[in-house]
UniProtKB/Swiss-Prot annotation:
ATPase subunit of a proteasome-like degradation complex; this subunit has chaperone activity. The binding of ATP and its subsequent hydrolysis by HslU are essential for unfolding of protein substrates subsequently hydrolyzed by HslV. HslU recognizes the N-terminal part of its protein substrates and unfolds these before they are guided to HslV for hydrolysis. Keywords: ATP-binding, Chaperone, Cytoplasm, Nucleotide-binding. It is found in: Cytoplasm. GO terms for biological process: protein unfolding; proteolysis involved in protein catabolic process. The lineage of its organism: Bacteria, Bacillati, Bacillota, Bacilli, Bacillales. The gene is hslU. PANTHER family: ATP-DEPENDENT CLP PROTEASE ATP-BINDING SUBUNIT CLPX-LIKE, MITOCHONDRIAL-RELATED, ATP-DEPENDENT PROTEASE ATPASE SUBUNIT HSLU. The keyword Amino-acid biosynthesis does not apply. ATP binds at V20, G62, V63, G64, K65, T66, E67, D277, E343, R415. The keyword Amino-acid biosynthesis does not apply. InterPro entries: AAA+_ATPase, ATP-dep_Clp_protease_ClpX, ATPase_AAA_core, Clp_ATPase_C, HslU, P-loop_NTPase. This is ATP-dependent protease ATPase subunit HslU. It comes from Geobacillus kaustophilus (strain HTA426). CDD domains: RecA-like_HslU. One of its GO terms (cellular component) is HslUV protease complex. One of its GO terms (molecular function) is peptidase activity.
């Protein structure tokens, strides 16, 4: 089944493979994604009228807000970027302008489309790359250069040269056929070959990027570098590495960049997802007032037309933001969603609250997802020939430790598990190459021994866990 035609229930099931709990948030993004598919089936007049319902996620850090949006985008191959609201400044101040988020989205979209197009021509590119490798491994005799152009007219030495090469050419062709066969059978992968590649030289105006020049809606580096001659340098590589470089070069020749650009802009406009994190940090807090609040409100007012739907100039042309899906997120500890300016509140009609993680959630996070942390450590130690196992009681003990440290210090959600597991397995990871055993079982006693004293000492746990 194509990703675009997944039902909301199927989307939630896919997200469940990576994220534990948070059913309401998953349900909201699944409906938003399905609505995009429904909109694509409408006739053109009505299609333009149906706008995406942007989502505001409310919940503490580490509960899955970003991961839900990122996995959703990956699921359907949509261009996705995450930006932090605090990085933007009001127009006229030093810092990034809000339109840069749309430009970044288009860049991501171009990269996605280009990668897909290059994969489509990969077989042809590989054939061309192998031909070039054969020519590099068995170079032909250099063609004789004619110093005097009149020799071409009067059939001098230049005309005689063609016949003298025929026997040598035959030998070269025979040798190349043999080398091509060896290449196809992987017999020359470690042979060294010299290839010419384009040199990536940093230009003097790189520092201008990010200093306000991006507001011109064009990439100055591209404009100026196109006027300068391309420099090539020679590199000596193994055949296996040279093939990758040559495949990339040949694939670039086979794709039409104008077509890539048009498709990328269309993809960004119709399927793009922009995740705006820490939006609560630019809300007017009831406790604080002053110039900082004015600045935050200015950023909100700058974000408003982008979310409402406007046209942003990029180096790939104008991009309409009307149908881009915006997902904003924040913890809202110091502020409330109602502290955002009313116009911006109205542009995020769907609000979902993500729950804090319980001990049971931590247990599930450790073992259930496809990329669960315990599975990652087991795979890492398997490379050293060690089978790592956790008893059920040990997993629960780890979850309890994570929950307790979150309660007594800063609550960083599931990210706490990374710190705790790294501390728990620190000695084992250090000694693994020399330990000389093939199986390790983590028990509750081992967890207590490694982490117990740190957890009990609040000051120590603040620094270590």
């Amino acid at each position: 089944m194509m990703a675009e035609t997944l039902t909301p229930r199927q989307i939630v099931e896919k997200l469940d493979q990576f994220i534990v709990g948070q059913k309401e948030a998953k349900k909201a993004v699944a409906i938003a994604l399905r609505n995009r598919y429904r909109r694509s089936l409408l006739d053109e007049k009505l299609r333009d009228e149906v706008m995406p319902k942007n989502i505001l996620m409310i919940g503490p850090t580490g509960v899955g807000k970003t991961e839900i949006a990122r996995r959703l985008a990956k699921l359907v191959g949509a261009p996705f970027i995450k930006v932090e609201a605090t990085k933007f400044t009001e127009v006229g101040y030093v810092g990034r302008d809000v339109e840069s988020m749309v430009r970044d989205l288009v860049e991501t979209s171009v990269r996605l489309v280009k990668e897909r197009k290059m994969n489509e021509v990969k077989d042809r590119a590989e054939q061309q790359a192998n031909k070039r490798l054969v020519e590099l491994l068995v170079p032909g005799k250099p063609k004789q250069t004619i110093k005097n152009p009149l020799e071409l007219l009067f059939g001098g030495q230049g005309a005689q040269a063609d016949n003298s090469y025929s026997h040598e050419d035959e030998q070269v062709e025979q040798k190349r056929r043999q080398v091509a066969w060896q290449l196809a059978n992987g017999q020359l992968e470690n042979e060294m070959v010299t290839i010419e590649i384009e040199e990536q030289t940093p230009l003097w105006f790189d520092f201008l990027q990010g200093a306000g020049i991006e507001q011109m809606g064009m990439n100055m580096q591209d404009a100026l570098s196109s006027l300068m001659p391309k420099r090539r340098k020679k590199r000596r590589l193994k055949v296996s590495e040279a093939r990758k470089v040559l495949i990339n070069e040949e694939a670039q020749k086979l794709i039409d960049m104008d077509e890539v650009t048009q498709e990328a802009v269309r993809l960004a406009e119709q399927s793009g997802i922009i995740f705006i994190d820490e939006i609560d940090k630019i809300a007017r807090s009831g406790a604080v007032s002053g110039s900082a609040d004015v600045s935050r409100e200015g950023v909100q007012r700058d974000i408003l037309p982008i979310v409402e739907g406007s046209t942003v100039m990029t180096k790939y042309g104008p991009v309409k933001t009307d149908h881009i899906l915006f997902i904003a997120a924040g913890a809202f500890h110091m502020a409330k969603p109602s502290d955002l300016i009313p116009e911006l509140q109205g542009r995020f009609p769907i609000r979902v609250e993500l729950a804090k993680l319980s001990v049971d959630d931590f247990v599930r996070i450790l073992v259930e997802p496809n990329n669960a942390l315990i599975k990652q450590y087991q795979a890492l130690l398997a490379t050293e020939g060690i089978s790592l196992e956790f008893s059920d009681d040990a997993i629960r003990k780890i979850a309890e430790v994570a929950f307790e440290v979150n309660q007594t210090t800063d609550n960083i959600g599931a990210r706490r598990l990374h710190t705790i597991l790294e501390k728990l397995l620190e000695d084992l990871l250090f000694e693994a190459p020399d330990i000389g055993i093939d199986k390790v079982v983590i028990t509750p006693q081992y967890v207590e021994q490694k982490l117990g004293s740190i957890v009990k000492n609040k000051d120590l746990s603040e620094f270590i866990l």
